[in-house]
């Protein structure tokens, strides 16, 4: 009995440590998300074509950061200020989207499971800080752009999403199209860059303006110049 308990405990510890051991390996390569794996195993539609960060127009990562994580360049994986605002709103009975950084979403997508769970959040926080410490901001963003869900039919990554929405590679997106892609996050099933409604178009205009902010121009390196 004790041996079985010991084996179970060691197995649990091993599972908890596995993401921390795998993270340094993700400095290179084309990692996939747990949702992509699940859809493949279950036979659900899934398409993804990796695109390198350097091939993307600068407006795309800037628009996504403006949309999803305005403090991406300055935080260490967790945006504590935004998190406190979300908690304060929850105490007041207001449940708003927000609080999860791009780094947290990478942690969840690579190693954890979707849906709301206190257990998942407890695992996600230290993992996001570890990812931020081990990977560069550019690499974190590159992974996010290639594993986020970006279409209603199992399109994962901005390349598959761009080909679905506009019929061409993400490498050739205009600033307006890049902002539309950012505007459909985090719900590309209900929102559409292909046939954007008034709300999506309004958000895209906001993100286009935010993407020009000076602080987003020096956050990462290696992207082709404007």
From Swiss-Prot:
Question: How does this chain sit within the bilayer?
Answer: Single-pass membrane protein
| GO BP annotations listed | cell wall organization; peptidoglycan biosynthetic process; regulation of cell shape
Lineage, top-rank taxon, reads: Bacteria
Q: Does the keyword Ligase apply?
A: no
Task: Kindly list the places in or outside the cell where this protein is found, as annotated in its UniProt entry.
Answer: Cell inner membrane
Q: Keywords on this record?
A: Cell inner membrane, Cell membrane, Cell shape, Cell wall biogenesis/degradation, Glycosyltransferase, Membrane, Peptidoglycan synthesis, Transferase, Transmembrane, Transmembrane helix
- Which Gene3D superfamilies does this entry report, sorted A to Z? Biosynthetic peptidoglycan transglycosylase-like (1.10.3810.10)
Q: Which GO terms describe its molecular function?
A: pentosyltransferase activity; peptidoglycan glycosyltransferase activity
Q: Which GO terms describe its cellular component?
A: peptidoglycan-based cell wall; plasma membrane
Catalytic activity field: [GlcNAc-(1->4)-Mur2Ac(oyl-L-Ala-gamma-D-Glu-L-Lys-D-Ala-D-Ala)](n)-di-trans,octa-cis-undecaprenyl diphosphate + beta-D-GlcNAc-(1->4)-Mur2Ac(oyl-L-Ala-gamma-D-Glu-L-Lys-D-Ala-D-Ala)-di-trans,octa-cis-undecaprenyl diphosphate = [GlcNAc-(1->4)-Mur2Ac(oyl-L-Ala-gamma-D-Glu-L-Lys-D-Ala-D-Ala)](n+1)-di-trans,octa-cis-undecaprenyl diphosphate + di-trans,octa-cis-undecaprenyl diphosphate + H(+)
List where the protein spans the membrane.
Answer: 7-29
Describe its function: Peptidoglycan polymerase that catalyzes glycan chain elongation from lipid-linked precursors.
Protein name as catalogued:
Biosynthetic peptidoglycan transglycosylase
């Amino acid at each position: 009995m004790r041996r079985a308990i010991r084996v179970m405990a060691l197995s649990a510890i091993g599972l908890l440590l596995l993401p921390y051991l795998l993270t340094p390996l993700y400095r290179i390569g084309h990692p996939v998300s747990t949702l992509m794996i699940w859809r493949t195993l279950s036979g659900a539609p899934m398409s993804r074509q990796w695109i390198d960060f350097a091939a993307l127009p600068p407006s795309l990562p800037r628009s996504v950061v403006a949309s999803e994580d305005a403090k991406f360049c300055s935080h260490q994986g967790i945006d504590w200020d935004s998190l406190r605002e979300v908690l304060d709103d929850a105490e007041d009975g207001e449940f708003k989207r927000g609080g999860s950084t791009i780094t947290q979403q990478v942690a969840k997508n690579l190693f954890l499971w979707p849906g709301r769970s206190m257990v998942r959040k407890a695992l996600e926080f230290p993992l996001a800080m570890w990812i931020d410490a081990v990977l560069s901001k550019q690499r974190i963003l590159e992974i996010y752009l290639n594993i986020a869900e970006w279409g209603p039919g199992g399109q994962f990554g901005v390349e598959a999403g761009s080909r679905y929405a506009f019929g061409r590679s993400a490498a050739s997106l205009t600033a307006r199209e890049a902002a539309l892609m950012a505007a459909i996050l985090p719900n590309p099933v209900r929102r559409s860059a292909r046939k954007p409604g008034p709300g999506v178009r309004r958000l895209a205009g906001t993100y286009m303006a935010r993407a020009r902010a000076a602080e987003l121009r020096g956050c990462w390196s290696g992207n082709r110049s404007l």
